[in-house]
């Protein structure tokens, strides 16, 4: 695999980038007086909806997820290396494995929780979970499914399924890193893993859980040792970790975040948002690179963010959120620095 394998792909992406909603369009959506106005604004976008659909959160979600699934299918077809897309589709694969194994374990119908996004079909994953074998998926994935099922059988707790597949997911990310073999994706993978650990510790603290619980919830696949991160958070020194992520310019958003870290006021939900902001800014600053997988990843991360923002704004309107409440919760807009 060479960086030049992505040249034609990146040209295609540069054309499709024009379909992202602009800052002006976002302002118009936020200022729209009624659903008819919103419907008019969304015409000729991938998110076209009627005024009636815009009054129904379930209908909104259907349109948004249809577009997300379409995007992933298109990118899997477009990318010369499917592992690049898997960096972000794998979260859905492991979510589906959790659901399918819980269906097997409990006999309950949880099929509405399945999300058909990923390299492997729902049918392939279902066969894997039910038979503990597959000629389609990675051998390492077969091993992880077998191990997780064995742990469930030993403890008879569905929590074992969640813990088992969480660990497997991060091991999978590191496997993808090796397969992609491009040092430019390392900061992305480190961010996905390290932020998970930081958020796990913060959530444990918010629930008044001890260190043993924290260690159990964390993964050893991070770039920073578990105990170091725990010490940073407990001592309000998390900015020591975050400021070492020197792959982005530290504008006002990140300066505000580090201040909250030093004051010990940063919450788990705020860290989730910070992770998204970091990935956005990292990929934004690499926007002039014409070779390699980062252009494709920037598009994918941008699409995920746009759909999150639309979900917030469109369902927020249904639920009566004020404009200020929506804007303060929105993530970054594609093509802009933060």
Predicted regions and their residues:
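N-terminal domain-start signal
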Residues: 1-338
